[in-house]
Amino acid sequence: MREIVHLQTGQCGNQVGTKFWEVLSDEHGIDHNGNYIGTSDDQLARINVYYNEASGNKYVPRAVLVDLEPGTMDSTRSGPLGGLFRPDNFVFGQSGAGNNWAKGHYTEGAELVDSVLDVIRKEAENCDMLQGFQITHSLGGGTGAGMGTLLISKIREEYPDRMMATFSVLPSPKVSDTVVEPYNATLSVHQLVENSDETFCIDNEALYNICFKTLKLNAPTYGDLNHLVSLVMSGVTTCLRFPGQLNSDLRKLAVNMVPFPRLHFFMVGFSPLTARGSQSYRAVTIPEITQQAFDSKNMMTACDTRLGRYLTCAAYFRGKVSMKDVEDQMQSFQQKHSTQFVEWIPNNVQTAQCDIPPRGLKMSVTFIGNSTAIQDVFKRIAEQFSAMFKRKAFLHWYTGEGMDEMEFTEAESNLQDLIAEYQQYQDASALDEDIEGEYIEEEELVQE
């Protein structure tokens, strides 16, 4: 079967990742010790995508947990899911990266990377037909960002033809953890542009907004935010894990979603999201959840989709839904909002469907969009980056670990290029004939 090996790096990556395994185990009827306690054959039909069957009918996640300090690992190990993971798959250092990208990428992380790759190799050898890798990490810190991108490039070297999907938590202006986030994020995006096949961008600010405005929570915790992320991760991977009518895998998703290789940064959304007390007052219908899924208030990336245009998008429906209704809904949405879609990619909305809804819901939809509006997020990071880099603020922390200023300049210009590319395709219309020409020239330059 088409297996996926899951990696989680750094504090954020491990917390989001652990939440993801919680949701996954619940959906597949696996208890905290890896025993199957489910009731439906569908739960086991494609369970080996994410789980390895060990002796005594135990199911073990194909997960590798990485961090440069033991703290998060210890809490995972002593938490409810501690008995689920394979003990050898916890790989951690002692020193921490101190939110320093250079430590994660060049010094501390580089020392640990070989032992992580050994574990990854073991997991990959356990697969019949490895489909690819997925990694959860944040881009603002040291381990998830620095060591995460180091792992991605090493895996890329060793498995060049396998898919690489990343769930990346971007730093956001209102929810800032450290002052050097713009540096770490710019250096990370510089790596992701080259080495990832699909990056699902998630940011804390958007998650907070959903918690406050939609879910009506007064004091959302990181647990609430991680729960939202895990809903999306579970939705994105539904088609890979359950038998369904229209199945999709990481590669099909990329083929449908990535019109140009560098533009693989997606925004994600999930619907229905309702405040706890008000669920019983509304019937969830296909038009309603489709409407909510496309609403920019529901996006887990803080940018306004109405200001950009969709190059492509995908909607994964779960539950007993009629495909005809779904197709009609998607058609009517596209016609109503035709200006939000580029006209030079016909049929740029893909739908897939799976019969099994998430726990507690009759139906749900996960939305994935490749929109030019995502440049807002990159612009925000680029502005903060250049404000600090102009004055060379905090740079000594990075040069002290052996980095060169040149690398910062390169990362900055790569980010600016990415923003310009998104803008170029946003402005392009079907009548511009030279866009294809420009693109081909760019390709040739890259290959030289």
UniProtKB/Swiss-Prot annotation:
GO terms for molecular function: GTP binding; GTPase activity; metal ion binding; structural constituent of cytoskeleton. Keywords: Cytoplasm, Cytoskeleton, GTP-binding, Magnesium, Metal-binding, Microtubule, Nucleotide-binding. Pfam families: Tubulin (PF00091), Tubulin_C (PF03953). It is found in: Cytoplasm, Cytoskeleton. PROSITE patterns: TUBULIN, TUBULIN_B_AUTOREG. This is Tubulin beta chain. Its cofactor is Mg(2+).
